[in-house]
């Protein structure tokens, strides 16, 4: 496996580890999710270019569209939670607390 693929997989694993470690803050979780989506985009683009899959050139663009939608929904949720509670703790999103 070339070193570029190893570095991209390591970036994905680092973002996944960041999501697991910093799961108490919504902003940190959103940044780690964006890092995961970016590494998946770069990895899928490199695989498609290396394997010469001409029919699947739209897959990375579709992945970017879903990443943009995820970022928009995440930022809207962050604004809503910070305006309601004043903090970005994920524990505030528990619906069982009344």
Curated annotation (Swiss-Prot):
The membrane spanning regions, by residue number, are 2-22, 29-49, 61-81
Sample GO molecular function, one term: NADH dehydrogenase (ubiquinone) activity
InterPro entries hit by this protein: NADH_UbQ_OxRdtase_chain4L/K, NUOK/Mnh_C1-like
* Pfam families, per the entry: Oxidored_q2
Q: Which domain of life is it from?
A: Eukaryota
Mention any one GO cellular component term assigned to this protein in its UniProt record. mitochondrial inner membrane
EC number annotated for this UniProt entry: 7.1.1.2
Q: Could you provide one GO biological process annotation from this protein's UniProt record?
A: ATP synthesis coupled electron transport
The UniProt similarity line reads: Belongs to the complex I subunit 4L family.
Q: How does it assemble?
A: Core subunit of respiratory chain NADH dehydrogenase (Complex I) which is composed of 45 different subunits.
What does this gene product do? Core subunit of the mitochondrial membrane respiratory chain NADH dehydrogenase (Complex I) which catalyzes electron transfer from NADH through the respiratory chain, using ubiquinone as an electron acceptor. Part of the enzyme membrane arm which is embedded in the lipid bilayer and involved in proton translocation.
Q: What is this protein called?
A: NADH-ubiquinone oxidoreductase chain 4L
Its taxonomic path starts at: Eukaryota, Metazoa, Chordata, Craniata, Vertebrata
Gene label: MT-ND4L
